[in-house]
Amino acid sequence: MSHPALTQLRALRYFKEIPALDSRLLDWLLLEDSMTKRFEQEGKRVSVTLLREAFVGPHEVAEEVALLPVESRYWLREILLCADGEPWLAGRTVVPESTLCGPELALQNLGKTPLGRYLFTSSTLTRDFIEIGRDAALWGRRSRLRLSGKPLMLTELFLPASPLY
């Protein structure tokens, strides 16, 4: 059974262009650096609650597949990023199987390590785009990232306790 925050994350609807929003809100939504690091800058101890890690078929990641290479399997990781034990962010990472070679194979073994701790230590990380999304009162974003030119999708939903609000 899926966590309610993941249901909300999948319900995000994305803006075609960056909306006119308060600068503080945009600062969070368009952050290029690690969200883990940003939460730690708020003086919090960051931890991961792992909800799901598994290979899945394209039908389970249909929205992300539209922005990734078509493959038969994708590595799916769904988490809650918590600050002092309180969920601040729901995250969903979709990685094409072809991305999981060489150093990027480590993406399968993150366990309770925040994704940002891995991604933002890589000198090969690039970001193709950030799209801002909203579902009811909650804000989120998604990005296509590349490690050594190999793509993955990261979707993040800011939960009500997050300092974004």
Swiss-Prot record:
Pfam family, one: Chor_lyase
Catalytic activity: chorismate = 4-hydroxybenzoate + pyruvate
Record keywords: Cytoplasm, Lyase, Pyruvate, Ubiquinone biosynthesis
UniProt xrefs under Gene3D superfamilies: Chorismate lyase-like
The EC number(s) this enzyme carries: 4.1.3.40
Protein location: Cytoplasm
One term of GO molecular function: chorismate lyase activity
Residues that coordinate or bind substrate: M35, R77, L115, E156
Biological-process GO terms, alphabetical: pyruvate biosynthetic process; ubiquinone biosynthetic process
Coiled-coil blocks: none
Pathway where it operates: Cofactor biosynthesis; ubiquinone biosynthesis
EC class: lyase
Transmembrane regions: none
GO cellular component: a single term: cytosol
Described purpose of this protein according to its UniProt entry: Removes the pyruvyl group from chorismate, with concomitant aromatization of the ring, to provide 4-hydroxybenzoate (4HB) for the ubiquinone pathway.
HAMAP family according to UniProt: UbiC
Family the UniProt entry places it in: Belongs to the UbiC family.
Subunit: Monomer.
Name the record gives this protein: Chorismate pyruvate-lyase
UniProt organism field: Citrobacter koseri (strain ATCC BAA-895 / CDC 4225-83 / SGSC4696)
Classification of source organism: Bacteria, Pseudomonadati, Pseudomonadota, Gammaproteobacteria, Enterobacterales
Gene name of the record: ubiC
